[in-house]
Amino acid sequence: MRSTTHVCAAMSLVLAASAAPGGQTLYNGIVLPEQWPPRRAELSREPMPVPYLKSPPKVIPIDVGRQLFVDDFLIEATTLKRTCHLAEYHRDNPVVTYDKPWEKEGRAPFAAVFSDGVWYDPTDPDGPGFKMWYLGGYLKGTCRATSSDGLHWEKPPLDVEKGTNITMRHYRDSSTVWLDHAEADPTRRYKMFTTLSKDGWRLALHCSPDGIHWSKPLAVSPKIGDRTTVFYNPFRKVWVWSLRISYSGVGRARAYREHADAVEGMTWEQKDTALWLCADKLDPHHPKFPQVAPQLYNFDAVAYESLMLGLFAIHQGPPNSQCARLKIQKRNEVLLGFSRDGFHFHRPDRRRFIGVTETDGAWNWGNVQSAGGGCLVVGDKLYFYV
């Protein structure tokens, strides 16, 4: 494959109880089915059905978060027209680039989130501020950057590898760093779910009090697909594993796994997972390769106000072998979805929320990936990082 470079960028968008098992009622009045998570018989190119939109609760409590009109869940009748907005790239992009020797190691220079995580930590002993964990050097390790405003980033040296901002040197693919505000143990405030090459890809869970010094793996998962990620659903107080799978007819897709405990949840059997998400017939195609069917390359999610915000990385091809032959990037762009039960995602707008350029060598040439943690609320804007 042709050597490529990857850097991190920022976008902004102007803001327009315990885990409930099957049969129980959620914070918004939705009653979960007896079998939870739901068992989809198959994945197909048809858009995902969203049961709570077809049959909403008779009474909808609205005392959790601001209520967002991204669907008709809260609307009985209206003459208004819903308008969706797209993210805007910041004028100073890329906000993080490969400017350190260790970021130029591996098959290609790399300094960008590959999920990983971008967070604002209000209780950091060194002072509140923005923190970014990113892939530094292609598959070579995880680095950490800091910022006072979320736009201008620095890479202060750490004591893990003297003179560098490396927090963990490890052969990795996908990784998620999560700031767990609900964690009672201060040594586990930060959680890193990172891929581990051990007889195929597996997921290892590390914890840290500061996001710099990480524990040895507290748990290692069964075999997984390389682009597997994890997020926390605070409405139901469960961790969710977004498991990368391949499925006949739709290609790259997702299986679902949830557990209230991050460590215990790292061990599962096939029966503990459920078919979940895939690209469908409404997703965009590559403008130069329209014959290639879209696939779901990755899926991250985060709680925002009164719902779960999903970031769908839609792969539009061409296949890796063809990319190598043509010396181009495979095309991945980020689209949005919304969920009120954490499983069924409504996707009303299929435009490219965070798009790419076809300009050879540009920082966002062909391929962008969402950050773990989804987005940050900064004033009256949302900051997204890719």
Positions of PLM-derived features:
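Bacterial N-terminal signal peptides that target proteins for export
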Residues: M1-A9
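Bacterial N-terminal signal peptides
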Residues: C8-A16
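Carbohydrate-active catalytic/glycan-binding domains of CAZyme proteins
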Residues: A20-V386
